[in-house]
């Protein structure tokens, strides 16, 4: 069965987006395509229709391919928890926590078995598999236990593209150095080089490309220009780069950049709004006076809550809320807004009872059982009757202590979230809540009303359509500069 692989000289070379673009380009040719990443380390996750957890990047690639995301597309997901530990998600289910030095000893064999099983299933269901590597395939200290790079390519005998970020500088050294560190059987799989994030005129680069091809015997199959668009990111470090000021912005939203922030793809739809400026606020930053503050999800809610309190930002958020500011919490952020979080089993590695922000009269109990499911419900607030979709990824259950009529359910299922009658405090377990265009606009209009701004129209669709346009724009931008014909013809 035909398969391609994309590996990179470094992290952040653009593997995920180029893989997504290839998936869309093959789909346009009429093929049924599946993305694949054997092992991903990320805190942005997605829940499949079967209730399994995979990396959000593989879900994005599946949407690019026009297929439903499944757990086979990312059989191993590692979710860092700090202190060199990660939660291990195997075939969609969390199976434990492990230290970095223990991971390969405990999970290498079972992990490779899961990868092979997943590939076998994808081969049965699809015409093409487009595989993505992780980091670099030439990490000498890790190669013997690398599950997700050229071991996969060798298993599939997949021709492989070696991608380099030319914007960082040193791209020729990166490519030659990577090749030199590969074993001969690995090197034979590299069928083309791709330069990514190029700024400038290709003719000024041509002499270097000619030298590279002559030196290695491997063709340069792509020089892809810098694409100045906002695409989903897997690394919270990239949030530091999202500092563009919008001249037409009328509303500012401060998202707290927790040390272990998770699922920050929740805010892509907000960033797509021309009238909204999203500002990511670190623990040492000033909160300022935004129109709303959002507490996002976290992989280690208790540790992030303690860091938030130690930094003084927790008190700043309480003061902001007391002055009538709008605060919205998603998942772990929702849990933080309550009275207490109780983790009597040490689910996150710390046992005990912990003070929340006391914005909601709620208690949250952590248990080993993890809630993973897609949800469909109907909104009650800020606009009743809106159909809502999203997904839950959380450990712990939250209960409202008070029978006070001051707090109301946001959705038909009261367990999914609540708000106060004034519309100042909001909390929900639903990831993807802002993907619901009408609900997003209704919530933004509540902020705009306070500033005396005209309401935005709410008759807009789901963010899925906008995301699909974004994928098309990505693929259109890549297609003229990436020559896949030699690989496709050979296969």
Curated annotation (Swiss-Prot):
All residue ranges annotated as the GATase cobBQ-type domain in the record = 250-439
Q: Which InterPro entries match?
A: Class_I_gatase-like (IPR029062), CobQ/CobB/MinD/ParA_Nub-bd_dom (IPR002586), CobQ_GATase1 (IPR033949), CobQ_N (IPR047045), CobQ_synth (IPR004459), GATase_3 (IPR011698), P-loop_NTPase (IPR027417)
Q: In which pathway does it act?
A: Cofactor biosynthesis; adenosylcobalamin biosynthesis
- The active site consists of 331, 431
Name the Pfam families for this protein.
Answer: CbiA, GATase_3
Q: Which GO terms describe its biological process?
A: cobalamin biosynthetic process
Q: Molecular function (GO) terms listed?
A: ABC-type vitamin B12 transporter activity; catalytic activity
Q: Which UniProt keywords apply?
A: Cobalamin biosynthesis, Glutamine amidotransferase
Write out the similarity annotation: Belongs to the CobB/CobQ family. CobQ subfamily.
Its annotated function is as follows:
Catalyzes amidations at positions B, D, E, and G on adenosylcobyrinic A,C-diamide. NH(2) groups are provided by glutamine, and one molecule of ATP is hydrogenolyzed for each amidation.
This one is known as Cobyric acid synthase
Q: Which organism is it from?
A: Synechococcus sp. (strain ATCC 27144 / PCC 6301 / SAUG 1402/1) (Anacystis nidulans)
